[in-house]
C-alpha cells in the first residue's frame, strides 16, 4: 500500500492545495493531509478549525485523511507508516527550499521518498498568505479557495475586522 503524506499549514486551504490533494489521491492508495501545528505562528484558524475545513473539502475522497501533527515531519511520516512525502512546487524558489528539506528528510529516514508535484498553472500564483492579504482588504477570495470554505473564510475575516 502506497501512503503519501502532504504536509502544510493550510491556513487556509487553497484551490491549489486541493488540486494537489486530488491529483495525489489518484496516485496513492492513501493520502494523509498533515496539518502542521506551529506554536510560533498565530494562524487565522486554529489547528482544529483547519482540520475541519480541509475535511469539508476532501469529504468525497475515500482515500484521503486529515490529521494534525507537531514536531518533525519525518517522525509523523514514520508513525503513519507512510513511504512518501508529497510536496507541491509553484516556482523555482519553492524547489530550492523543498529540495534542501527533502535531502534532510532523506538523511533522517532513507526509506522515505519525497515526491514533487508541480502546481497546475492556473493555481501557481495562489498562496494562503496572498489570500489572507486580499481578504483583509475586503477583496474577493472565492476564486482562490474551495467553494466548501468560502463562507467560513468570509465570516472569519469579518470577525477579525470587528465587523461581526
From Swiss-Prot:
Pathway recorded for this protein: Cofactor biosynthesis; coenzyme A biosynthesis; CoA from (R)-pantothenate: step 4/5
Residues annotated for ATP binding in this entry: 9-10, 17, 88-90, 98, 123-129
GO CC annotation, single: cytoplasm
Site feature: Transition state stabilizer: 17
Co-factor(s): Mg(2+)
SUPFAM superfamilies reported for this sequence: Nucleotidylyl transferase
EC number annotated for this UniProt entry: 2.7.7.3
Substrates-to-products reaction catalysed: (R)-4'-phosphopantetheine + ATP + H(+) = 3'-dephospho-CoA + diphosphate
Single annotated GO MF: pantetheine-phosphate adenylyltransferase activity
Keywords tagged on the record: ATP-binding, Coenzyme A biosynthesis, Cytoplasm, Magnesium, Nucleotide-binding, Nucleotidyltransferase, Transferase
InterPro entries named among the record's database cross-references: Cyt_trans-like, PPAT, Rossmann-like_a/b/a_fold
Subcellular compartments: Cytoplasm
Database matches in HAMAP family: PPAT_bact
Protein family according to the UniProt entry: Belongs to the bacterial CoaD family.
This protein's name: Phosphopantetheine adenylyltransferase
Organism: Clostridium perfringens (strain SM101 / Type A)
Gene name of the encoded protein: coaD
Amino acid at each position: 500500500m502506497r501512503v503519501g503524506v502532504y504536509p502544510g499549514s493550510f491556513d487556509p486551504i487553497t484551490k491549489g492545495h486541493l488540486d494537489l490533494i486530488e491529483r495525489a489521491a489518484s496516485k496513492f492508495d492513501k493520502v494523509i493531509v498533515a496539518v502542521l501545528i506551529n506554536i510560533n505562528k498565530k494562524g487565522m484558524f486554529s489547528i482544529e478549525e483547519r482540520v475541519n475545513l480541509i475535511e469539508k473539502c476532501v469529504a468525497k475522497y475515500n482515500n484521503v485523511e486529515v490529521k494534525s501533527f507537531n514536531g518533525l515531519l519525518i517522525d509523523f511520516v514514520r508513525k503513519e507508516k507512510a513511504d512518501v512525502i508529497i510536496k507541491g512546487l509553484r516556482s523555482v524558489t519553492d524547489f530550492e527550499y523543498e529540495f534542501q528539506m527533502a535531502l534532510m528528510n532523506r538523511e533522517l529516514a532513507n526509506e522515505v521518498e519525497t515526491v514533487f508535484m508541480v502546481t497546475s498553472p492556473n493555481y501557481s500564483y495562489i498562496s494562503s498568505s496572498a489570500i489572507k492579504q486580499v481578504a483583509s482588504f475586503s477583496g474577493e477570495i472565492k476564486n482562490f479557495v474551495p467553494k466548501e470554505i468560502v463562507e467560513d473564510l468570509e465570516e472569519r475575516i469579518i470577525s477579525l475586522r470587528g465587523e461581526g
